[in-house]
Amino acid sequence: MFIGPTGVPIPPPEYATLANLLYVHANNPNQALPILYTPEELYPITGVKSLTLNQSVSEGLTILGNYIQNQITNGPVTVFGYSQSAIISSLYMQQLAAQGFPISPADLNFVLVGNEMNPNGGMLARFPNLTLPTLGLDFYGATPSNTPYDVAIYTQEYDGFADFPRYPLNFISDLNAVVGIATVHTKYLSLTAAQVNSAVQLPTSPGYYENGGKTYYYMIPTEELPLLMPLRAIPVIGNPLAALIEPNLEVIVNLGYGDPNYGYSTSYADVQTPFGLFPEVSPSTLIDAFANGTRQGIQDFHTELQALATQPIEFPTFTPPQPADLIATLSNLPSPEKIVNTAATVISTDYAVLLPAADTALAFATSLPLYDSQLFLEQLVQGNIVNAIGYPIAADVGLVTIAGIVQFLVISKAISQNISDIRALIP
């Protein structure tokens, strides 16, 4: 049974086909792949009138529970969850755990991708016990790792929702991750089978599988840093410049996860791992990593320049407008009424952006100071003065970066709508 991600309440058949081909591998040639409707809304990303995450997840959780109870008598159920539906699936596992796992392990299993509740990397697990009431957003914690059900969780490296840095004081790493929300998190069904098959199985705590653990965690490598995608988009020189700086920038980004060689936390995947302050990396390791990165960057830059030299130069063509075209354009100009209506629509769209901005500001003015004070007191009681001061700062850096990308997405959506409305006026 296939559930959509945020913004896709009713996935098309192609969605289920791809998800099955890449991740689930159900072999039912004579049966249609079942699709389950859930709200999949997320204020403000899916719109200023959308349900909040808490509301959408709550409704989805009820729908999923009812579906499984109705279907379980007909045979085993496999749940495929992506992004928000991975959250719903994780919370359903929590419900089953609280009930003593009433459903037989032979009758239920899960395949999750882009899971914001990954124990070690999920954004909702990195900042435990945080709630933002003005945004209707609770940080739910981690997907249970102690269920008797077979669970496979796939994550792409640098997916900011499912693979958020462990050390958020590293702003560059945070920024790369939040760019990855738009460029990596949305691409799980765009991968090839070879890319999915290249996934690395992540380590779990000693004895996890021997003691009955049944959740398998996989990391799919991402070839290029999301942070450099805007640079690569620059014609001609973009790719060479990105190739030059990427190896060393990757070291900096990866330090946000704890190891300059990996864009994900290499500690146990089944253990909820909250954010920390500084990674434990020796100076010699850093020196070697930057030295190797510098050599690799120069080599890649040279390779890109050689490839650039072999490409023919193409000049743009220009066709001057003809008088007949100008006359036709003038005759099709929009009416004053249409211009006024479009202006009103644009103003309304832009005004709507202010509401989520105000809610975010209120959350940062109320909920965040409370969270910071809790972090401070927890560390102070433990006698750790450095963490008492550093943890609130690290949390703020990470959360402000997340809020920034959310506002950017909201504003970008409004600008896109404005452009579409204005284009409709042009004959």
Predicted regions located by residue number:
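Lipolytic serine-hydrolase domain surface
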Residues: P13-L21, H25-S50, G122-Y264
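Serine-dependent carboxylesterase/thioesterase catalytic core
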Residues: L61-Y158
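Conserved catalytic block of serine-dependent lipid acyl chemistry
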Residues: T78-F80, Y92, M219-E223, T273
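Residues at beta-strand starts and edge strands
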Residues: A106, G212-K214, A269
